[in-house]
Amino acid sequence: MLDPNLLRNEPDAVAEKLARRGFKLDVDKLRALEERRKVLQVNTENLQAERNSRSKSIGQAKARGEDIEPLRLEVNKLGEELDAAKAELDTLLAEIRNIALTIPNLPADEVPVGKDENDNVEVSRWGTPREFDFEIRDHVTLGEMHSGLDFAAAVKLTGSRFVVMKGQIARMHRALSQFMLDLHTEQHGYSENYVPYLVNHDTLYGTGQLPKFAGDLFHTRPLEEEADSSNYALIPTAEVPLTNLVRDEIIDEDQLPIKMTAHTPCFRSEAGSYGRDTRGLIRMHQFDKVEMVQIVRPEDSMAALEEMTGHAEKVLQLLGLPYRKIILCTGDMGFGACKTYDLEVWVPAQNTYREISSCSNVWDFQARRMQARCRSKSDKKTRLVHTLNGSGLAVGRTLVAVMENYQQADGRIEVPEVLRPYMNELEYIG
């Protein structure tokens, strides 16, 4: 959520920055609501002051032996007017907040302006795509050859966009997640966490999934039953529970940065993806991901983004997978991000790069929703922290990349050296 003071005092500047994202801010409506808020605020404060004054007069009149009934009636009437004014103000403030919750984050100044993914800017490349001297098989064909990917069984159990993994393919999937966790915890300084896969609505509001993206989630009960404490949603990413661990907390600055990682399944309805990537593991309703989250001082967040992106890159480099790094343009960034790098891995069967990691600096956008603050040791003042999140990596898509990039002419799949300790030193699948 954006700073309310910024929306009040600099709406035109905010609107200009949001326009870079393709978001039209209704400045006139915001101004009208703000003017109304000021009037109601003053009216409420005046009624409160008048009621307090009259209440004090009752005691004074009583001490003088005067009839207090007229004053008592007046105080009661003022109380009713005050309650009505407060209710009207609360309704207006709720309307302003609901609007604020639908406004995306401001893009950082260095983010390239653009409309969609076609305007993203490539930053660098690592590795050279392998040249094959045989017909390339895609991961679905390879998975079926080794009885490792069973989409038909998943359709029987659940439906489309699910998979049953078996045998050595399932083992490699597990090995990838273990390798990623070990790398991030042992070399990159993250603490491993196990988190709930179901979260409440406060948690989803904290990281920005609600109210705007309710349709992308799997809910245990209809969304309108929000007040019920047992109404949960499956997590779309471990970013949600990990980041919310600091909700309503004040953290001493010398405890920052906080670096957390978790391996979880992720659940997404893919509501806007009908007809896209219908074959294979690229776009699933349920997929595994190793997530990285950092909680940092505001002045450290841009450097932390570079560091976190480097941590995701290291996974790909150690696996020997060619990839490219791009900076997302304003029109392609996620709702809460102020700056995002995507890593795209080479997928031979598609002859293209596909997203495998997204690393974002969210600035204080989530922290304001969560009221997550840090305290300076010198002056004891508090301020909002900055939060960052990144995929390190999406496990299923990494499996796709390994299977296709390491395939052999006879259909066997070479196991990357860094994964062999997790697979009893197995060199080939098949």
Swiss-Prot record:
A GO molecular-function descriptor: ATP binding
Which residues are ATP-binding?
A: R268, S269, E270, E355, I356, S357, S358
Where is it mostly found? cytoplasm
GO biological process terms, semicolon-separated: selenocysteine biosynthetic process; seryl-tRNA aminoacylation
- What metabolic or biological pathway is this protein involved in? Aminoacyl-tRNA biosynthesis; selenocysteinyl-tRNA(Sec) biosynthesis; L-seryl-tRNA(Sec) from L-serine and tRNA(Sec): step 1/1
Q: Which Pfam families match?
A: Seryl_tRNA_N, tRNA-synt_2b
Substrates-to-products reaction catalysed: tRNA(Ser) + L-serine + ATP = L-seryl-tRNA(Ser) + AMP + diphosphate + H(+); tRNA(Sec) + L-serine + ATP = L-seryl-tRNA(Sec) + AMP + diphosphate + H(+)
Q: Where does this protein reside within or beyond the cell?
A: Cytoplasm
Which residues hold L-serine?
T237, A238, E239, E291, S391
Query: What are the entry keywords?
Result: Aminoacyl-tRNA synthetase, ATP-binding, Cytoplasm, Ligase, Nucleotide-binding, Protein biosynthesis
Q: Which InterPro entries match?
A: aa-tRNA-synt_IIb, aa-tRNA-synth_II, aa-tRNA-synth_II/BPL/LPL, Ser-tRNA-ligase_type_1, Ser-tRNA-synth_1_N, SerRS_1_N_sf, SerRS_core, tRNA-bd_arm
Q: What is its EC number?
A: 6.1.1.11
- The top EC class, named as a word, is ligase
Quote a single Gene Ontology cellular component term. Answer: cytoplasm
Q: Which PANTHER family match?
A: SERINE--TRNA LIGASE, SERYL-TRNA SYNTHETASE
Q: What does this protein do?
A: Catalyzes the attachment of serine to tRNA(Ser). Is also able to aminoacylate tRNA(Sec) with serine, to form the misacylated tRNA L-seryl-tRNA(Sec), which will be further converted into selenocysteinyl-tRNA(Sec).
Tell me the domain comment: Consists of two distinct domains, a catalytic core and a N-terminal extension that is involved in tRNA binding.
Q: What's this protein's family per the entry? A: Belongs to the class-II aminoacyl-tRNA synthetase family. Type-1 seryl-tRNA synthetase subfamily.
Matching HAMAP family, A to Z? Ser_tRNA_synth_type1
Assembly and partners are described as: Homodimer. The tRNA molecule binds across the dimer.
Task: Spell out the protein name for this chain.
Answer: Serine--tRNA ligase
To which species is this protein native? Salmonella schwarzengrund (strain CVM19633)
